[in-house]
């Protein structure tokens, strides 16, 4: 495929003396740039008593540094360079993206890097109010979370932090102290547990010099060790009654292998066979032919060691059993029949184009390499696409069989009729 040749691009990977891995990804001609730090810190590394602490730390670093001791002062210093910072806490990583013009993004990065070495953590009580409001957005009047994604993950991975909500609990957030923040920062925010990826129309030497100034004296520390789930999921159906809503939120899910397993790439092919555009199987059958849902999606969420494959939909309460039946039928078809050549070729082409598009967006290019390296994936755009294209129809079918041939798990938040619950349970 000629497009594969277009995915080769310049890059430099190096390690600072303190163990921080740095990726430099030049994007000639692009006027915007991204300096992104990925830290292996998230809810899967927490305990019941510390659940939510990773998310709290992510909020609190924006409160300033010793040199810029307030949120306003920190943001002003960065925004004067035409840049801004975005951050996200996930299950297995926390990302910080300094986004700005290529001329000034490295200066903005150096300013923001101060918060990892010398955060001030001022205004914690004020920030707790914001965090409390964020959590309460997903709670019902009885204080129960109605986030179906959280409910599904808890169902798939019981008694393990992979089943925790990233935002934590109201009780934990109220109890956390500045000392807790400092302890968490000291454990996870260290050079050997992070990766810096910088993408833009920048000189490699300039990036390396800026990275050295910004992070060269960051403490080395130790990388985090994963604890792989060992407890089997035992509840095929869980539901939370949420009266008053017009629709029920559904997740039909399966446990999977992790991002480095042999089946990881075939599962990505399976994902795209099911849900890759409005012409894909899921949209065609569920929306166009059956009219069951307006919003429907499917995806493989692969962590370093394990993962999950979900079919998600919001449907009228009475249509929930039909939606579950269709999800089970469509995944069963993927497990028992090979995809037609024309369909597989379309999926391959669209994947190549989507990966090539990363070269146009520095932050997306940085994310591909930075988050991938944090998961232990030593791949490039070209090698990722080559391995995707190399998956034939039988290999995709076999991977689907290994996942969808196992127990399916259904989570639902909504006002399900009892008859609907019985129908769903009978399918499982």
Predicted regions and their residues:
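N- or domain-start disorder-to-order transition segments that initiate the globular core
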Residues: 1-32
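C-terminal regions of mature proteins
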Residues: 2-3, 9-11, 195-197, 348-428
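An aromatic/glycine/proline-enriched structural segment found at the starts
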Residues: 2-7, 12, 158, 162, ...
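Buried hydrophobic packing residues in well-ordered domains
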Residues: 19, 37, 55, 78, ...
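M16/MPP (pitrilysin/insulinase) zinc-metallopeptidase core fold and M16-derived inactive scaffolds
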Residues: 29, 34-99, 165, 273-292, ...
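Acidic/histidine-enriched segments that form metal/cofactor-coordinating
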Residues: 39, 66-69, 73-184, 205, ...
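A structural supersecondary motif
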Residues: 251-255, 274-315, 355
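Extended amphipathic alpha-helical segments enriched in small hydrophobics
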Residues: 313-340
């Amino acid at each position: 495929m000629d497009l594969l040749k277009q995915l080769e691009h310049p890059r430099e990977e190096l390690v600072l003396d303190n163990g921080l891995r740095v990726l430099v990804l030049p994007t000639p001609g692009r006027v915007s740039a991204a300096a992104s730090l990925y830290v292996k810190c998230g809810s899967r590394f927490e305990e019941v008593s510390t659940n939510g602490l990773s998310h709290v730390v992510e909020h609190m670093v924006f409160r300033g540094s010793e040199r810029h001791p307030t949120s306003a002062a920190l943001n002003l210093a960065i925004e004067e360079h035409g840049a801004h910072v975005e951050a996200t806490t996930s299950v297995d990583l926390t990302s910080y993206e300094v986004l700005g013009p290529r001329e000034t993004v490295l200066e903005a990065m150096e300013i923001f890097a101060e918060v990892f070495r010398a955060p001030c953590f001022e205004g914690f009580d004020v920030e707790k109010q914001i965090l409390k409001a964020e959590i309460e957005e997903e709670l019902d009047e009885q204080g129960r979370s109605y986030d179906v994604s959280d409910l599904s993950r808890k169902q798939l991975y019981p008694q393990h932090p992979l089943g925790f909500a990233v935002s934590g609990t109201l009780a934990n957030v109220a109890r956390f102290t500045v000392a807790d923040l400092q302890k968490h920062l000291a454990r996870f925010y260290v050079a050997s547990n992070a990766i810096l990826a910088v993408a833009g129309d920048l000189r490699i030497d300039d990036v390396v010099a800026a990275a050295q100034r910004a992070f060269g004296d960051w403490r080395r520390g130790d990388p985090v060790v994963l604890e792989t789930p060992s407890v089997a999921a035992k509840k095929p159906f869980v539901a939370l009654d949420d009266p008053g809503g017009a629709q029920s939120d559904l997740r039909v899910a399966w446990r999977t292998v992790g991002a480095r397993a042999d089946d990881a790439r075939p599962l990505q092919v399976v994902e795209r066979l099911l849900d890759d555009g409005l012409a894909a199987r899921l949209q065609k059958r569920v929306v166009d032919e059956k009219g069951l849902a307006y919003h429907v999606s499917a995806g493989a969420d692969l962590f370093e060691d394990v993962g999950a494959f979900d079919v998600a939909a919001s449907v009228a309460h009475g249509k929930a059993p039909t939606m579950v039946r269709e999800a089970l039928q469509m995944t069963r078809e993927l497990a028992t029949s090979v995809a037609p050549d024309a369909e597989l070729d379309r999926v391959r082409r669209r994947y190549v184009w989507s990966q090539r598009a990363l070269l146009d967006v520095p932050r997306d290019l940085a994310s591909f390499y930075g988050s991938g390296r944090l998961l232990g994936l030593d791949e490039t755009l070209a090698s990722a696409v080559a391995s995707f294209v190399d998956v034939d129809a039988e290999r995709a079918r076999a991977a689907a069989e290994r996942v969808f041939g196992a127990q399916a798990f259904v989570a639902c938040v909504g006002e399900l009729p009892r008859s609907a619950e019985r129908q769903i349970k009978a399918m499982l």
